[in-house]
Every structure is written in structure tokens, then in C-alpha cells.
A protein has these predicted regions:
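Disulfide-rich extracellular domains of secreted proteins
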Residues: 1-159
């Protein structure tokens, strides 16, 4: 894959100007189960192992229809190669029954949990990819630093 980003001059820093040369996108996958594991896991028992693939394969997954259920995951630290311009979380989801639900991306930094206000509607049996871009740490409101990523948990919540 190529690393690319587009800054269109709108919004807040750092996404409103040229970011400079020498940056790259680092993909991280869950490395262990986080503080919350409310969702059902197949085949089990480790929640993170069911979602640590870069592409879904329908043999391992977590699922829930219960509003408020939260599943969090720890991630390994990225390589120390310069500043962090943002964090982007990708989630692939679909419904397996007939009940539509809203899916929210959740970030836990230290002891504070933050989720999207509205979330995204999951109402299709085909996989949909939901992306949440966070140029700033939504818990602190300032630019990401390495310590933020080292102590980060990210996951999903039924809205």
C-alpha cells in the first residue's frame, strides 16, 4: 500500500496545511484484549485475536446487539520514527441478523474513555468500512504524542 493524505486547507491544524516530507502511515493491529470485553467472541476466548487481521475473514469476529456494549483493544507501540500527525481507526462491520445498530469508535487514553457522538449506522449484511480520523487526541484536545499511543486502547461500542 502507498501512504498518502490529503489536506485541503480547511479544519484545524495539522490537517489544513502541507505536512512536510518524510512521514509515513503505520498500521497497528490489536495485540491484546483491553479493559472492556462486553461483545461475544467467535471462536474465543481472546477478543483481540478475533479482530487482529488487516482484512476480515468471517471465521473470527466479535458481535453484539446490546446498546452500550464496549470492546477495547491494546496495541503495540509504533516504531519511534518522528512526530505523530494523527490517528485513524478503521472498523469493518456488518449485521448478522435483522437488528440495525449504530457503531461508535471508542478511544481510551489513561482512564478517560471517549466515543463518537453519533456513530455510524450498521444496517447492511455486506461489510462496511468505517473510518475515524483524529488529528488531535480527543481526550486531551492537543496533538498526539508517543506516550498517548503507548497508553492507548481503541475499540467499538454499540450505540
Amino acid at each position: 500500500f502507498d501512504d498518502f493524505w490529503i489536506c485541503d486547507g480547511t479544519g484545524g491544524a495539522p490537517c489544513n496545511d502541507f505536512l512536510g516530507f518524510g512521514h509515513f502511515v503505520q498500521s497497528l493491529v490489536p495485540s491484546s484484549t483491553g479493559d472492556d470485553s462486553d461483545w461475544d467472541v467467535t471462536p474465543g476466548p481472546d477478543h483481540y485475536a478475533a479482530v487482529d487481521e488487516l482484512e476480515q475473514d468471517d471465521t473470527e469476529y466479535v458481535e453484539s446487539i446490546t446498546i452500550g456494549d464496549l470492546d477495547l483493544y491494546h496495541y503495540d507501540s509504533p516504531p519511534a520514527l518522528g512526530g505523530i500527525k494523527g490517528l485513524q481507526v478503521h472498523t469493518e462491520a456488518r449485521i448478522t441478523g435483522t437488528i440495525e445498530r449504530t457503531l461508535k469508535t471508542v478511544i481510551k487514553h489513561n482512564y478517560t474513555t471517549e466515543s463518537e457522538d453519533a456513530g455510524q449506522m450498521v444496517g447492511n449484511s455486506n461489510y462496511l468500512t468505517f473510518t475515524r480520523l483524529m488529528p488531535l487526541n480527543p481526550v486531551t484536545g492537543v496533538a498526539w504524542v508517543r506516550d498517548d499511543i503507548d497508553n492507548l486502547q481503541a475499540g467499538v461500542k454499540v450505540g
